[in-house]
Curated annotation (Swiss-Prot):
It is found in: Plastid, Chloroplast thylakoid membrane. GO terms for biological process: photosynthesis. It comes from Cyanidium caldarium (Red alga). Seems to be required for the assembly of the photosystem I complex. GO terms for cellular component: chloroplast thylakoid membrane; photosystem I. Belongs to the Ycf4 family. InterPro entries: PSI_Ycf4_assembly. It is a multi-pass membrane protein. This is Photosystem I assembly protein Ycf4. The keyword Membrane applies.
Amino acid sequence: MKKIKRDKIVGAGKISNYLLLIIMLGGGISFFIVGFLSYFKAFEHIALFSRFVNSDIRFIPQGITMIFYGTMAICLSIYIYFSIYYDIGAGYNEFNLISKKVVVFRKGFPGKNRLIKFVLPIPHLKSVKVMARGGINPKYEVFLYTKNLSRIPIGQVFKLSKLEYQASEIATFLGLAFEQYNL
């Protein structure tokens, strides 16, 4: 039987984040340019914009609003870019029966607390719990509960069936109780 189990956690470098970055940056730049050009009434002179943009866009209030939304989208895309670059949230969960410790390691933004590492003794753990909230925006999470009722998130977001399997596998490996809680 294996004595060490290590689960890799994927961070912000997912394909969905790359797509979100491209769409948000493209839309933000487009909004910013249209809003900026509305100040100069330059739509009549630029063939590219005259086909796609109504030349009746006034700088106040439409142009200013488009510049604002474009700037916000560009700022959010910069945030997403740095999240991908620094691979925020990536790490691993290591369950070691030899040393009787669980290590939860994650990466964060640069600074004093860039690397987050929890080391928990297995005897202090109480259970592995899956929390599921259904509805329009479902949320599934796996937690390690300690005996003093602190909870440490250890799971990634999967489909519920895969998440339950992962949690039950961890509970069996560590010899802990497995609980499920539906909201």
